[in-house]
UniProtKB/Swiss-Prot annotation:
The gene is pheS. GO terms for biological process: phenylalanyl-tRNA aminoacylation. Pfam families: Phe_tRNA-synt_N (PF02912), tRNA-synt_2d (PF01409). NCBIfam families: pheS. Keywords: Aminoacyl-tRNA synthetase, ATP-binding, Cytoplasm, Ligase, Magnesium, Metal-binding, Nucleotide-binding, Protein biosynthesis. Binds 2 magnesium ions per tetramer. Its EC number is 6.1.1.20. It comes from Coxiella burnetii (strain CbuG_Q212). This is Phenylalanine--tRNA ligase alpha subunit.
């Protein structure tokens, strides 16, 4: 019996040592320690031995059973560690490789400028108004004292739909609509996209504009100049030099264009138009021009962005080149 036990133990040791997977190891356990296993069969035969030998043989069988179980446990741990190491080696990261970076989005420079302009005018007591981009001729032209024979109303300058529908050429129609709803006095700005048939280094068919309007009983051109100077100083965070040049707009009288001085190039760049609201515009809204007066101004947000970020070509803002937009 003892020889059988020793032979069985050596056979189990070899089988466990040769096992290369948990599945094979489980088969070995069943083969030796299962209900019908080799060691279990030997344990059953102990009862047939002489009574004085049974305790010693039973003890020997249990010791071999315990040793085989320890061999199985040790081999199982070894196989799990080996499997884990192989998995880690497959998933190993080469830290010498160049990393993969996610491209983070950013706020478009025009949107940045638009938000900044809105905040500054809100601080100056202006309300923010919006209106439709598809307008009719009355709000875009007639209510603003632009007659039918005015050059701005030709198809060479304006995008027309059928009938009297068109893409608005400025945000002034928003001011007319708000005065119809609110009456006067009023103090507001209107921001948004506007459309004109123009394309060069400083013009695009679609651009962004903010127009301001103040109607009160004692509004003067001096108020207008002071407001624009204060706004532009705040926007550029420094004192800027402005030049007011006499100009003509159908909806303001007197009118002026405003240039801002660029020290870097020693040149002046036009940034906005302004003037006192024309009496005819007030009359169109049943407002007495002898009692009320006001001023209006229109600023190209794209021009402001060009100046703030020192961009020389306006079209760069609309070409969706991430190399350019990623700089802001």
């Amino acid at each position: 019996m003892q020889n059988q036990l020793n032979t069985l133990l050596q056979s189990a040791k070899k089988s466990v040592a040769d096992a290369q997977s948990e599945i094979v190891l489980e088969e070995i356990r069943v083969d030796y320690l299962g209900k019908k296993g080799k060691l279990t069969e030997l344990l059953k035969s102990v009862g047939q031995m002489p009574a004085d030998q049974r305790p010693l043989l039973g003890k020997a069988v249990n010791e071999i059973k315990r040793e085989i179980q320890q061999l199985l446990n040790a081999k199982s741990t070894q196989l799990r560690e080996k499997s884990l190491q192989e998995k880690l080696n497959k998933e190993k990261v080469d830290i010498t490789l160049r990393g993969r970076y996610d491209h983070l989005g950013a706020i478009h420079p025009i949107s940045r400028v638009s938000e900044r302009v809105s905040q500054l005018f809100s601080m100056l007591g202006f309300q923010i108004a919006e209106g439709p981009e598809i307008e009719n001729e009355y709000y875009n032209f007639e209510a603003l004292n632009i007659p039918a024979d005015h050059p701005a109303r030709t198809m060479a300058d304006t995008f027309y739909f059928s009938g009297d529908k068109l893409l608005r050429t400025h945000t002034s129609p928003v001011q007319i609509r708000e005065m119809e709803k609110q009456g006067v006095p009023i103090r507001l700005i209107a921001l948004g996209r506007v459309y004109r048939r123009d394309l060069d280094q400083t013009h695009t068919p679609m651009f962004h504009q903010v127009e301001g309007l103040v109607i009160d009983k004692r509004s003067t051109f001096a108020n207008l100049k002071g407001l624009l100077q204060q706004f532009l100083n705040c926007f550029f965070e420094k004192d800027v030099r402005l030049r007011f040049r006499p100009s003509y707009f159908p909806f303001t009288e007197p009118s002026a264009e405003v240039d801002i001085y660029q020290p870097r190039t020693d040149k002046w760049l036009e940034v906005l138009g302004c003037g006192m609201v024309h009496p005819n515009v007030l009359r169109n809204l049943n407002i007495d021009p002898d009692e009320y007066s006001g001023f209006a101004f229109g600023i190209g947000l794209d021009r402001l962005a060009m100046l703030r970020y020192e961009v020389t070509d306006l079209r760069l803002f609309f070409e969706n080149d991430l190399r350019f937009l990623g700089q802001f």
